[in-house]
Regions:
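Glycosyltransferase donor-sugar binding loop
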Residues: 227, 254-267
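A conserved mid-protein helix/loop that constitutes part of the nucleotide-sugar donor-binding site
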Residues: 18, 222, 226-245, 264, ...
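Acidic donor-binding loop of glycosyltransferase active sites
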Residues: 295-310, 327
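Carbohydrate-associated surface elements
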Residues: 180, 203
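Conserved acidic donor-binding segment of nucleotide-sugar-dependent glycosyltransferases
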Residues: 340-344, 348-355, 364-370, 385
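Nucleotide-activated donor-binding/catalytic signature segment of Leloir-type glycosyltransferases, i.e.
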Residues: 267-288
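A short, well-ordered alpha-helix in the C-terminal region of glycosyltransferases
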Residues: 357, 364, 371-398
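Short hydrophobic beta-strand element within catalytic cores of glycosyltransferases
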Residues: 319, 324, 328-331, 341
């Protein structure tokens, strides 16, 4: 039997982090024992069926409880270590008020989580995101000596960088979802980080999706789809503007946007542009429904941007799902996206925050569907070669075996 790995994630279940769920399931299929330690155990209106079996297994530690108080009292028996952990954590988060406040809340429960992991025989910790999960992994490592690793994604290294260098340097290894991320970290932290950073993509299971040729016939409604939470860096306003341009050009279309978040401002844009019944905000959907909706579409769009604060994508898993479904992809040329959407090879790239360029490229997909589908087939093949779940999890498992 393989060693027991503790997975730390910010919140569970979380609809937009299905890729972590898939990774844990695949590791278990490979014989690893996985213990889930979410920092927040939350209720959601839509929960993937695969997540249901993990909910009762989650080792959730409340922020304040008798057990947390007891664990801290025990830790105080070594006052110098206790004070040093508090001092270093608060000092390294001092320039980020939000992180400082959250660190003060997470620190007490980290002592109890460390106690539980020792009792459970955890041999290694893997944290998804270099923010709060990595902080707790680092704290437990300092308390117990249990090694830890981190998967870095996007906002956790591009924007929220409090204590980032410490968390990365003390990690046994780092898994980056893109080459872009690895080079970014090497430039930010130093070349030593590059040496222990490995490319582990957030993979998909291609067989989950129906990959078939779907060419829009002349006069047929052009079915566009996007999947992603309604956050500013996803660029949905530019997609709506592009749809308005296409509509003004006389192209009959429907654009379905799947994802949770506030819809008020986007709905207002849709009404002002006269796109009611053309652009549909469908809210969060379970994975099987996402797969079904992809199978009824002609083109996938990823209009992501870089926000003024620097927030941007890593490599959206939704693009992988769209490619696995055989869809042509139009995306913006930011962060790690060009590693998947290779211009005129596996898809189309346009500048971010440019609705006219986005509309022009979508129009080309509509008017030349044969070429678009040639790229779609190449994209589907690339996903199967480099972004398939099992092969990426095998690379991660190999790193665990080398500990």
């Amino acid at each position: 039997m393989n060693s027991k790995i503790a997975y730390i994630m910010s919140r569970f279940p979380h609809l937009s982090e299905t890729f972590i769920l898939r990774e844990m399931n695949e590791l278990e299929r490979h014989g690893w024992q996985i213990a889930l330690y979410p920092l927040i155990l939350q209720k959601q209106p839509v929960v993937h069926a695969e997540a249901e079996r993990w909910i009762p297994r989650a080792r959730y530690v409340p922020f304040f409880s008798a057990e947390v108080l007891s664990a801290n009292a025990r830790a105080l028996l070594k006052p110098h270590r206790y004070a040093a952990l508090w001092g270093r954590t608060l000092w390294e988060n001092r320039n980020c008020p939000n992180f400082l406040a959250r660190a003060m809340v997470l620190l007490p429960k980290a002592f109890q989580m460390a106690r539980l992991m020792e009792q459970e025989g955890i041999t290694h910790i893997h944290a998804h995101y270099a923010t709060h999960p990595a902080l707790v992994a680092w704290l437990i490592h300092r308390l117990t000596g249990i090694s830890y690793s981190i998967t870095v994604h996007a906002h956790d290294i591009f924007v929220r960088t409090a204590m980032l260098g410490t968390k990365l340097r003390d990690a046994t290894f780092i898994a980056a979802i893109s080459e872009f991320n690895r080079e970014y970290l090497a430039n930010l932290i130093g070349p030593s980080v590059r040496d222990k950073t490995h490319i582990i993509h957030c993979g998909v299971v291609p067989s989950t999706y129906q990959s078939r040729l779907r060419l829009p016939k002349e006069g047929e409604r052009f079915e566009i789809i996007n999947v992603g939470s309604l956050q500013p860096y996803k660029g949905h306003p530019y997609l709506i503007q592009a749809c308005a341009i296409l509509h003004q050009r006389g192209i009959r279309l429907r654009c379905r946007i799947i994802g949770g978040g506030s819809q008020d401002s986007l709905n207002q844009m849709i009404v002002q542009a006269g796109l009611e019944g053309i652009v549909e905000l469908m809210g969060p959907q379970p994975q099987h429904e996402v797969a079904r909706l992809l199978s009824t579409s002609h083109c996938y769009v990823q209009p992501s941007i870089i926000t003024p604060s620097g927030k941007m994508e890593g490599i959206p898993v939704a693009i992988m799902e769209a490619m696995a479904s055989g869809l042509p992809v139009v995306a913006t040329s930011i962060s790690g996206i060009p590693e998947l959407v290779r211009p005129e090879q596996t898809g189309y790239l346009v500048p971010p925050a440019d609705p006219t360029a986005l509309a022009d490229q979508l129009a080309k997909v509509y008017t030349d569907p044969i070429h678009a589908n040639q790229l779609a087939q190449a994209g589907s093949a690339l996903v199967r070669q480099e972004f398939e779940l099992s092969s990426n999890v095998e690379r991660l498992a190999t790193l665990f075996e080398q500990l």
